[in-house]
Amino acid sequence: MDPNFSESLNGFEYFDGNPNLLTDPMEDQYPPPSDTLLKYVSEILMEESNGDYKQSMFYDSLALRKTEEMLQQVITDSQNQSFSPADSLITNSWDASGSIDESAYSADPQPVNEIMVKSMFSDAESALQFKKGVEEASKFLPNSDQWVINLDIERSERRDSVKEEMGLDQLRVKKNHERDFEEVRSSKQFASNVEDSKVTDMFDKVLLLDGECDPQTLLDSEIQAIRSSKNIGEKGKKKKKKKSQVVDFRTLLTHCAQAISTGDKTTALEFLLQIRQQSSPLGDAGQRLAHCFANALEARLQGSTGPMIQTYYNALTSSLKDTAADTIRAYRVYLSSSPFVTLMYFFSIWMILDVAKDAPVLHIVDFGILYGFQWPMFIQSISDRKDVPRKLRITGIELPQCGFRPAERIEETGRRLAEYCKRFNVPFEYKAIASQNWETIRIEDLDIRPNEVLAVNAGLRLKNLQDETGSEENCPRDAVLKLIRNMNPDVFIHAIVNGSFNAPFFISRFKEAVYHYSALFDMFDSTLPRDNKERIRFEREFYGREAMNVIACEEADRVERPETYRQWQVRMVRAGFKQKTIKPELVELFRGKLKKWRYHKDFVVDENSKWLLQGWKGRTLYASSCWVPA
């Protein structure tokens, strides 16, 4: 690599081909590169902040599965000879000139939801169908005298009340949730005008590492305000510190889970009542964890099928009316308070550039591209270098979103990236693939060409693939790894959530989930004030949904299936990969950056078994590695 690579980034010392030149990471005076990522999220937030309801920025498996079930019967009944949707991947591709080539790669006839989801209705019609589905699902709710849950659709604010009526032979617990289902807004226009001057100005502010628009000046004050407010809040609490009762939430939660697993609803409800009385979404880390897990346990009591869980979660959040902009805003605060995502992005960019020197074409296949947060800084970094690829190709693979246009989100991502490449004079070609089952993607669909350097990136998304729990012979997780191996990439960057709450047995999975999420809630408690609205929203929309899926769902509905980095290592070797060594200097560089960027001292960066590990207070939460075909 070019030893002056840090200078090529216009002053942002992201990487250096000779790490020995960065033995003292504190020497540079440049702002943290995470500011660039934060600005990118901010500008996407500007696009989303139109006041209308939009789908969440993240994949909601339960909502998608419920939509599938609704549409399956409708499509079966209404499909005629004149319209027969092809069971195929939706692929859209275009080059930097803006011309679009739409094509579908036909596959063998399969069920409608085998490859991708196709919605034949507008969003408004889907909402009406969804309401009917809720009514049908309500018929299957338990009506035992021991536990009655009444879901009322009201227009007033959500009220949660738990009333205990102890008798000689029964325990009745009643919980009322408002369910305010609003009509989903109409789909927006098909194409985004990337040539619009307002969008062009936005791009200048978002991702250009321009010395005249210093990201430290733009965002450092906001980031520090968030962190300083945490310190101020702690000081204020010391003055009004009251002695509070210590509650062992882990024990209460575990006992409740054990009662549920044995079918003892009465005992489970007694523990739930105790947890509800002591927990709070606005309390300390333990109280927030208990509140989150209590919701998940109650959902499991209601039923472990996807539609029923989705109905329950919608009842909990119906009055909150969060838009996609709200979710992105919460995600932005997460990025400012945690280095996990930023360092994972830098690690992948480092490894890709290391193998792409002097390549005529660099082709990046990104499994789970979503908004493509990490690629704008990559595009700018190669624009002024001589030893970089002369052309960039990106194939973005993502799960389809609900609605009439499953590939809309990743198409918009491609247009943003195409605009960046056009502004930096980087020849660019993009292809979007929306597929519900990544293991069914074929190598021909990826359009791999000779004489190009092929890099595969999978950031935190392979955990959502099914594993051997369903079938040891047809494991989607191994099938995707086999697909990547058959692609014969020059480098494969794999980032994971390091967790062991993927056991098929509920109690084992529950205990591990408690330990994992305890660290995450504690991290927020040490870096953000407790009354921060974005923190509350992030914990609800991200940790809450994940915990709900891990605890309440089973079989195909359970899509949160993380494994430890040691388990992934065995799986990768079995798939035919060998691991590349991580230079110790790179680990030291990242450690130095954590100190320079003023992240909390309890964030940990380490290396073990050729994995770059990131964690909190000694608990490993994320891991990144680099692989090549054996």
UniProtKB/Swiss-Prot annotation:
Residues 240-628 form the GRAS domain. InterPro entries: TF_GRAS. The keyword Nucleus applies. Pfam families: GRAS (PF03514). Residues 454-549 are annotated as: PFYRE. GO terms for cellular component: nucleus. Residues 412-444 are annotated as: Leucine repeat II (LRII). Residues 247-312 are annotated as: Leucine repeat I (LRI). Residues 552-628 are annotated as: SAW. A motif (VHIID) lies at residues 362-366. Residues 331-396 are annotated as: VHIID. Keywords: Nucleus, Transcription, Transcription regulation. It comes from the Eukaryota. It is found in: Nucleus. Belongs to the GRAS family. Probable transcription factor involved in plant development. This is Scarecrow-like protein 34. It comes from Arabidopsis thaliana (Mouse-ear cress).
